[in-house]
């Protein structure tokens, strides 16, 4: 059930976010003028392209489950700058921050949990390590299992 939840989170987040990146690429000058220059950041056109490609490529990586954590990191980074922009220009306006907060939380959740078993990352991990006793997407479960073994060993003393 958890892996299905991660799949849905990845696919819906990527599918809903990707158009924002394509819209930036369609008119990069307007995006730079409206969002990057007000923050007084250097190289506004370059940073606008970085934001757009982070959203487009990061979204595709989330959707496919390939290099998923890198995609989630790109999305979280770009969205954190968008949150900063929203706060600087409009204060703590919940109507601006709620969608950004959801995108950020989804990216951080995928970053923390990994892609799940329904991902290209998992297929690659299984192909590279055919004798693996546990899923690469379930490394936290493996760590929990190690902790249980240690607790059992201590209790048996």
Segments predicted by a language model, with ranges:
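Extended, low-polarity transmembrane helix blocks
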Residues: 1-26, 45-53, 57, 64-157
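Membrane-interface interhelical connector segments
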Residues: 25-43
């Amino acid at each position: 059930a958890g892996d299905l939840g991660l799949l849905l989170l990845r696919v819906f987040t990527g599918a809903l976010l990707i158009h924002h990146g394509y819209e930036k690429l369609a008119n990069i000058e307007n995006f730079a003028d409206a969002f990057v220059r007000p923050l007084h950041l250097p190289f506004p056109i370059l940073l606008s392209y970085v934001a757009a490609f982070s959203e487009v490529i990061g979204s595709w990586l989330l959707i496919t489950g390939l290099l998923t954590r890198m995609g989630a990191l790109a999305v979280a980074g770009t969205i954190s700058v968008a949150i900063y922009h929203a706060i600087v220009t409009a204060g703590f306006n919940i109507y601006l921050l709620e969608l950004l907060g959801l995108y950020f939380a989804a990216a951080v959740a995928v970053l923390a949990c990994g892609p799940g078993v329904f991902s290209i990352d998992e297929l690659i991990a299984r192909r590279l390590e055919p004798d693996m006793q546990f899923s690469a997407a379930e490394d936290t479960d493996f760590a929990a299992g190690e902790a249980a073994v240690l607790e059992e060993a201590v209790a048996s003393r």
